[in-house]
């Protein structure tokens, strides 16, 4: 079965069995009897320059898809195969993202076990999220290398992620716990940095936004359900079982993606086709465009592309800088709430550890409701516009949905902060978090899609830089969250003024999508990176 053949399991079977994939050489127009004879000289060849491979000026045979309907092209896979891959990416993202928040219910027990203060233990959350920032700088560019692809990075990094949970669970000091948490964040990051790219590999542009929503739900569900599952482990067993559970869930994901997740990278699939043709014909001139481009990069240039370009884009491009700061703020609020929720619901409402884990469900409910609305918006507004204009319309129009979303964030913060008091039922502040879920979801969807449309040639670097700054901002937020809320009060609304500070900052950010909508085209015309 072709689906299993393209998975890691299929590749391992092929490697250890000594098998070689057969290529339909007549279909590709390959002359196999003499590797030095040009294709045009093969009288029985069905070669068609415009349909398949082309010979460039250097005599290299550029390997491409066999027309628009080539069945090996991921965009032409059957629907069931695309749905399986989508599920794999979403489940992988859910499991890895859960690793950050599953830690929080055990902070008190870890503090008591290791005889340290609260802030040093919170570093276990901070360093894990900081790993999200560092990982994409490494793994995102590697996933674009044709010889590597995405699949191997997913599997190998997840194996390391699983192994890191063992010393984390067995550790008896922060000297063990903290480095392991940071490394786990680094090796868990590929799903977060390239998951969207995997979906873009298989879905047509007008369908891609729909399935990005499901991936986003996986990204939301992980940190939302993490505290609940972590709390259950802390109550039933101990804080160490948070990491054993994370290891078991991740191991299940590893089994699934090993057997049921084929490679989706177009450049890697074409590279493997070119490699098979080289082996079959003995002609070394079969190359892909990506293979040629990557071979022209020196190690220094590749390192610069990985480490320097993302930072340059984030700092020098006004559009990227402003949206990165905005997204970083919204992302930070979620991790601030990992400290604010226990303060409010334990101090004011006297919730148990398990009940504290349940309060995050408001964010998940809000995200699901927003997805339903967003589907309607896509179907009625964006997709018809995309089809009518054949995908060619000002990128700034993608930001329209972010206009109301920008107001939802401060509304949520003021609502949550000042309704969290003993005289108000506990469900009321939770309802306030629904506005955050809706606002953050719509902001993330619109802003990331806009950045991809505005910087198509450098989208990997833009997203890597965004992940670096966004995750760094979020990583720092738990360290000052408890002090901010405890020191601002007041006692009858313990998260009131702290939420107000965040709400005011969010209000300052509201004009950003409006300004980019108005001036974005002019800014892009002056940029050497944007289109």
From Swiss-Prot:
- Write out the GO biological process terms: xenobiotic detoxification by transmembrane export across the plasma membrane
**Cross-referenced InterPro entries, in alphabetical order?**
MFS, MFS_dom, MFS_trans_sf
SUPFAM superfamilies listed in its UniProt record: MFS general substrate transporter
Question: Which Pfam families does the record match to this protein?
Answer: MFS_1 (PF07690)
Superkingdom as given in the UniProt entry: Eukaryota
Q: Where in the cell is it found?
A: Endoplasmic reticulum; Membrane
- Keywords in alphabetical order: Endoplasmic reticulum, Glycoprotein, Membrane, Transmembrane, Transmembrane helix, Transport
- Glycosylation positions? 486
User: What Gene3D superfamilies does the database record attribute to this sequence?
Assistant: MFS general substrate transporter like domains (1.20.1250.20)
Regarding the membrane, this protein is recorded as: Multi-pass membrane protein
GO CC terms, sorted: endoplasmic reticulum; plasma membrane
Q: What is its main location?
A: endoplasmic reticulum
What terms describe the molecular function in GO for this protein?
Answer: fluconazole transmembrane transporter activity
List the PANTHER family. Answer: FLUCONAZOLE RESISTANCE PROTEIN 1, MAJOR FACILITATOR SUPERFAMILY
Family membership, please give it: Belongs to the major facilitator superfamily. CAR1 family.
Question: Which protein, by its recorded name, is this?
Answer: Transporter mfs1
Q: What is the lineage of its organism?
A: Eukaryota, Fungi, Dikarya, Ascomycota, Taphrinomycotina
